[in-house]
Amino acid sequence: MNNIIKMLNDEQMKQDVPAFGAGDTVVVQVRVKEGDKERLQAFEGVVIAKRNRGLHSAFTVRKISNGEGVERAFQTHSPLIASIEVKRRGRVRRAKLYYLRDRSGKSARIREKLATK
């Protein structure tokens, strides 16, 4: 029974998910259905949380839109996600960046992780 569940989970998991973590700026292309048309909607922001649970993995992205903070949680292996692109790597010392909710402006900045040789 356990092997069947593991096999089904492995079959449904996406293979093209890039490596990213908290503090990284990502662009998530989401499939949105409006009436009978389907289009891609981009959501760009900072990953403030990531949950690794195999097929049930999820991550939360936060962005500022018109001066208002917007957060959206995504299931990593959802068929509604067309692609995930990492724009910039952030250097943080926490796994969950919930403290960014209370900050704005310069105090909400995240240092960039420079590529190592």
Swiss-Prot record:
This protein is located at the 30S-50S ribosomal subunit interface and may play a role in the structure and function of the aminoacyl-tRNA binding site. The keyword Kinase does not apply. GO terms for cellular component: cytosolic large ribosomal subunit. It comes from the Bacteria. Keywords: Ribonucleoprotein, Ribosomal protein. It comes from Shewanella baltica (strain OS155 / ATCC BAA-1091). InterPro entries: Ribosomal_bL19 (IPR001857), Ribosomal_bL19_CS (IPR018257), Ribosomal_bL19_sf (IPR038657), Translation_prot_SH3-like_sf (IPR008991). Pfam families: Ribosomal_L19. GO terms for molecular function: structural constituent of ribosome. The keyword Ribosomal protein applies. The lineage of its organism: Bacteria, Pseudomonadati, Pseudomonadota, Gammaproteobacteria, Alteromonadales. Coiled coil: none annotated. This is Large ribosomal subunit protein bL19. GO terms for biological process: translation. Belongs to the bacterial ribosomal protein bL19 family. SUPFAM superfamilies: Translation proteins SH3-like domain.
